[in-house]
């Protein structure tokens, strides 16, 4: 049986075209703090760590260790991993804590080891697992923290990496909230022999991947001490990503300097403040409101399409939900 090449694409990989509303708009370099220019303390306050969670502790325990290590008031993680599961766990710090909400629509990727309870021909394994791509129906496991209602989830791709007897190693890209243990159970039923999950590792959470930004808890301890005790901030700075990393995949609306303070003071985003937008924004979409220096101002729900934002001269374009930028980064100009 020919093995088709798998296109590993998550929602976070979608490329978007930028549409410009005001070509003459500029930003004042005196205002704001672009991600690459933030002082170390500020970088940590508005940062997110691409943490390699070890098997053993719960996700909450890992976050608690990070808080204690850095003496933080707040921290949060994007997508709980069971204690035995390892891999990518984005941990947002202090003022960036609520940005993990932005990772929900981004998609996740795992590498799983499935153990079959009987012998199955390889061709059948490939054929049956291919059928699980697309919309599937799941009920959360008994031990899940959410109500056990039936719900649909999307499987973006399944790629078999290796088959060794009854063991099947595969990579899977899924919508947030998909239970891989349940997926494997149902694959086993479809194969007619039963199956269980032997091992699981998360390899992606939206824009956070197994790349040079992934750090272990041991790395963090070392890098933090290099900074605090030796004054060497280079390694610790690289270990913390700016919160803007967590919204890379979202459709964006860029606003002029004069509109920033109004949004940080609680106003929804009105059309006159818009300079450019991503193509394809639909009403109800979660969007990131950005400055012209690519600083994250807020997250909100689009109340207009991209086309309407470009064509209209007034009205509310984004219903702002969560504000991340401090009020004093840009001056009041109203």
UniProtKB/Swiss-Prot annotation:
Keywords: Isomerase, tRNA processing. Its EC number is 5.4.99.25. The keyword tRNA processing applies. InterPro entries: Dyskerin-like, PsdUridine_synth_cat_dom_sf, PsdUridine_synth_N, PUA, PUA-like_sf, PUA_sf, tRNA_PsdUridine_synth_B_fam, TruB_arch. The active site is at residue 82. This is Probable tRNA pseudouridine synthase B. It catalyses: uridine(55) in tRNA = pseudouridine(55) in tRNA. Could be responsible for synthesis of pseudouridine from uracil-55 in the psi GC loop of transfer RNAs. The gene is truB. Pfam families: DKCLD (PF08068), PUA (PF01472), TruB_C_2 (PF16198), TruB_N (PF01509). Belongs to the pseudouridine synthase TruB family. Type 2 subfamily. CDD domains: PseudoU_synth_hDyskerin, PUA_Cbf5. SUPFAM superfamilies: Pseudouridine synthase, PUA domain-like. One of its GO terms (biological process) is tRNA pseudouridine synthesis. Residues 250-325 form the PUA domain. The keyword Isomerase applies. It is an enzyme of class 5 (isomerase). GO terms for molecular function: RNA binding; tRNA pseudouridine(55) synthase activity. It comes from the Archaea.
């Amino acid at each position: 049986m020919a093995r088709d090449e798998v296109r590993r694409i998550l929602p976070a990989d979608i490329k978007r075209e930028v549409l410009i509303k005001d070509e003459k708009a500029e930003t004042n370099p005196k205002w704001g703090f672009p991600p690459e220019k933030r002082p170390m303390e500020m970088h940590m306050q508005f940062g997110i760590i691409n943490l390699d969670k070890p098997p053993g502790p719960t996700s909450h325990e890992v976050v608690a260790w990070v808080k204690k290590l850095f003496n933080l008031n707040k921290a949060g993680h994007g997508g709980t991993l069971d204690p035995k599961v390892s891999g990518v766990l984005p941990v947002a710090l202090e003022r960036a804590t609520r940005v993990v909400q932005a990772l929900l629509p981004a998609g996740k990727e795992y590498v799983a080891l499935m153990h079959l309870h009987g012998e199955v021909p390889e061709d059948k394994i490939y054929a049956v697992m291919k059928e699980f791509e697309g919309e599937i129906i799941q009920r959360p496991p008994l031990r899940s923290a959410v109500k056990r209602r039936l719900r649909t989830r999307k499987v973006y791709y399944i790629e078999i990496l290796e088959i060794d007897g009854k063991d099947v190693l595969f990579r899977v890209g899924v919508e947030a909230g998909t239970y891989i243990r349940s997926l494997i159970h149902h694959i086993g039923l479809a194969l007619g022999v039963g199956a269980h999950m032997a091992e699981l590792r998360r390899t992606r959470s939206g824009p956070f991947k197994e790349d040079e930004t992934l750090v272990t808890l041991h790395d963090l301890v070392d890098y933090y001490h290099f900074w605090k005790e030796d004054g060497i901030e280079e390694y610790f700075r690289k270990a913390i990503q700016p919160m803007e990393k967590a919204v890379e995949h979202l459709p964006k609306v860029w606003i002029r300097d004069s509109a920033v303070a109004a949004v940080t003071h609680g106003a929804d985003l009105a059309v006159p403040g818009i300079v450019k937008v991503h193509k394809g924004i639909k009403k109800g979409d979660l969007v990131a409101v950005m400055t012209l220096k690519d600083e994250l101002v807020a997250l909100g729900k689009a109340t207009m399409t991209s086309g309407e934002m470009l064509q209209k001269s007034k009205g509310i374009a984004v219903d702002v939900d969560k504000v991340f930028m401090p009020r004093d980064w840009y001056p009041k100009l109203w």
